[in-house]
Amino acid sequence: MRVPTIFTIGYEQATQAAVVSALREAGVEVLADIRYLPLSRRPGFSKSSLRAAVEEAGIGYRHFKQLGTPADGRAAARRGDHAELSRVYAGQLELPEALAQMAELRDLAEHQRVALLCYERDAAECHRSLLFDELFADFARVDLVPNLVVPAQAGTL
């Protein structure tokens, strides 16, 4: 019996094109945006722009707001306090709205190739890994890393 797979992807230091390319190369069918606020200062990663790009590439887009990290969890993540992030996120996942979205996402992932999207490049530093552990422990996990955009250093050509 084939073990189902969940993909994760973060867009930190990546372009929209690199993220879409990584999703296509992995055969992802649905991008599950698990950001509480699907907004970004990075061009191409706000909800409407990202949805348009992935749909143009033949990939579905779904936003699961209740599976995002609430404000106090995001603050803990910025401080590097993974224990507090875990505590806050565990509480988020107990809410009825989150439980409903977890069931919806689980069902989707049992029938299609799904990637969980958030900002952090390293899934271990992100709530993507916490959601995986809670909801998909019986799935294989593949962390996609899109080509990075490395800023040029001053004085180099």
Indicate residue ranges for each PLM-predicted region:
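Residues lining hydrophobic/aromatic ligand-binding pockets adjacent to catalytic sites
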Residues: 1-157
